[in-house]
C-alpha cells in the first residue's frame, strides 16, 4: 500500500512539473526569461525623497566626472540641465567647510577638463580616471576617514556608473550616502531610475543611503 501511495505521489509531482514548465515556456520551446517579460514588467513605486541636514565638517561632496567630454547639451543634455543646481550646492557646501572631491572619467582627461562652472578650488583633490568605483585603485577611503568624514554626497554625470558604484561602495565601507536625484544624470531616464531604485533597495546598502533633491539639503 505504501509503495502504491509513493508511486501515485511521484506521478502527481511529475504532472505538476510538466505544468510548471509549460507555464514558463514561450513559443519555440525556449524557457521564459526576464528579457521576454521586459515589455510587460511593471515599475515599482518611486522611492521617497527626504530632506537632509548635513554637518559640513563631517561631509564630503563627491563631484564625479562633470567634464567637457561627458557633460554638455549635445553629449548629455540631462547633465547640462543639472549643472547650475550642482554648482550652487558645491559653492554653499565649500563655503561652510565641507570637503569637495572631484573626479574625471575619460582616459587622458585632467582637472582642466572639468566644467568651468564646477572648477575645483585651490587644493581640492581631483581623482584621475578610475572607472565606475572611485574607491578602487585610489586612497579615497583613507582620505575620507582620515579627515573624519562620515557622510558623502554622490553627484555625477553617469548615474549607472559613478553614482551607483561609488555610492554603493561608500555605503559598504560604513559611510552614510546622500544621493540628490537631480544631481545625477545619464543619457536617458531609465539608468537614473534604476540607480535610484538599486541604491534605495539593495541589502546592506539601502540602510545607509538617503535619496533627496538638491533643494532639500540643508546645514
Predicted region positions:
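A short alpha/beta connector and helix-capping loop motif
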Residues: 75-93, 98-101
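Bacterial N-terminal signal peptides
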Residues: 14-24
